[in-house]
């Protein structure tokens, strides 16, 4: 609200890292341009077995509102000291992509790790391969079914755009937008 009142177009990403953030998640997603799923911090306050469940719910809620999601913390933690990730880490990255996260973030791996370049390249390879495997038509249908209310014009145009792009096997979608909202809705 403060940013809007001052006429700024700065995008706000809200870091969700504790129970208070989880309890206010819907309002936070609505108010922000996106969220960061800070799994490491969450794991300190929230039981470990709840973190993956909450991660999936947070991504789903943000995607439903056409908001960005950054999944972060310990994505390739083993690459701080090793040149290759664990298979579990590779699977974790792919699952975040399959769930609909719009960005994955390295922390210690690139800030203080012994293999920062390798970590970036590895994460990129895993993400790109996962993206190639996504059933985008199925994802679009699930997003459409998850919506509770009647779609507005932008949402209807977004679905139609994605459907036509899928039918034509389009390599890309280009959209004109003033605020980026239409592009975000198409991207989800």
Enumerate the predicted regions with their spans.
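Non-catalytic helical/linker scaffolds that mediate oligomerization, partner binding
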Residues: 1-188
